[in-house]
Every structure is written in C-alpha cells, then in structure tokens.
Amino acid sequence: MSSLIPIVIEQTSRGERSYDIYSRLLKDRIIFLGTSIDDQVANAVTAQLLFLESDDPDKEINMYINSSGGITSAGLAIYDTMQHIKPKVNTYAIGMAASMAAVLLAGGTGTRYALPHARILIHQPWVKGGIGGQVTDIEITAKELLHTKEKLAEIIAKHTGQPLEKVKEDSERDRWMSAEEAKAYGLVDVVVQPRERKKA
C-alpha cells in the first residue's frame, strides 16, 4: 500500500530531501482526511492538529475532507481537538463529506468550504453488526446510542444555526446535499468556484 503514496523530492541547502505527499502537505499546514474515520486515522489527524498548533499557534490550518464518515467516537476525538486548539481550522469538502465527516466539515473553526461537486450527507449514527448480550446491557447500549444521536444533532445545530428539532428531523434518514444546498443549510460558508484560466 505504501508504494501507492507519492513521494515529493525537494532541493534544500543540504541536498535533496524526500517526503511522502502527506508529510509535504503537512509542512504547508494542510491535513488531508481521505479515508473512513477509525481510531488509527483519528490518532493521526489529532496528532497533526496538535503538532501544527505547537509549530505555530497563530497560523491557520487547512483540512481537506473526502471521507464516507466512520466511527463516531473517533470522529469526535478529531472534532474536540479542532475546537480545542488555538489555530483556526478551515475545512474543505472535496468529493464527499458524509456522516461523521460532515460533522468535521461543519465544525471547522475558520472558514468552511465545499468544492462545487462535493456531496455532503447528514444522518443519524448507525451500528454495524448485531448487538447481543443481556437485556440490561442492550438497554444500556441503546441509551448510549440515543445520547450520541442527540449530541451529534446538537453539534450540527450549533454550527449550522438550524433549530435542533429540524436537524433531528433531517437526520432521521440519509440527507444528501450538494455544495450549494450545504451552504444554504449552514454546513459550509463558501462554495469554491473554479479558478479562471488564462486563455493562450
């Protein structure tokens, strides 16, 4: 898999230096979240956010998101770190920001962007696989899931300005949005238009 990650070679005063593409982007304060969110991904993104704050607490961070979502607790670790650190975090939806990734997109503390063909999805959290065990344990798990559902709706309402009840209603089923619809909803601030190219 690592052979699929491009390497960038730069000339320095000490000679050539090679970086994997993600490390090179990080040097420019760019974090790329381009996979589903699990604990390992959350740890890497959180570490990058903390490193960039340590490097320069007054300089903005740009996070590009192309993700189908993932584990809620892992996503909330990234979200809480974004809210905690001093640098503003600008978020960009490219391709898709679905489920937990849409929460991260909306939770940008700087400007929140969507590229023109990005698709954004909000919905309620869902559980993979079956839930088993004693009835009391299943009841405890169900209460925790309902608490998580409520918390995610509150986060989306906070960042979009939408009434909590509307967010809950809209999240009952998959709610896909175009970049423009996401802007109207309050998930993003700006739909990025293509750069003008000079004609030869």
Swiss-Prot record:
Coiled coil (residue ranges): none
Cellular component, GO, one term: cytoplasm
TM region(s), chain numbering: none
Disulfide bonding pattern of the chain: none
Record-level Gene Ontology MF annotations: ATP-dependent peptidase activity; ATPase binding; serine-type endopeptidase activity
Task of the protein: Cleaves peptides in various proteins in a process that requires ATP hydrolysis. Has a chymotrypsin-like activity. Plays a major role in the degradation of misfolded proteins.
Superkingdom to which the source organism belongs: Bacteria
Annotated active site: 99, 123
Keywords associated with the record: Cytoplasm, Hydrolase, Protease, Serine protease
Enzyme class, UniProt record, top EC level: hydrolase
Taxonomic placement: Bacteria, Bacillati, Bacillota, Clostridia, Eubacteriales
One family name in Pfam for this protein: CLP_protease
Subunit and partners: Fourteen ClpP subunits assemble into 2 heptameric rings which stack back to back to give a disk-like structure with a central cavity, resembling the structure of eukaryotic proteasomes.
Entry protein name: ATP-dependent Clp protease proteolytic subunit 2
InterPro entries: ClpP, ClpP/crotonase-like_dom_sf, ClpP/TepA, ClpP_His_AS, ClpP_Ser_AS
PROSITE patterns: CLP_PROTEASE_HIS, CLP_PROTEASE_SER
Family statement drawn from the similarity comment of this UniProt entry: Belongs to the peptidase S14 family.
Record localization: Cytoplasm
Enzyme Commission identifier(s): 3.4.21.92
Annotated GO biological process: protein quality control for misfolded or incompletely synthesized proteins
Substrates-to-products reaction catalysed: Hydrolysis of proteins to small peptides in the presence of ATP and magnesium. alpha-casein is the usual test substrate. In the absence of ATP, only oligopeptides shorter than five residues are hydrolyzed (such as succinyl-Leu-Tyr-|-NHMec, and Leu-Tyr-Leu-|-Tyr-Trp, in which cleavage of the -Tyr-|-Leu- and -Tyr-|-Trp bonds also occurs)
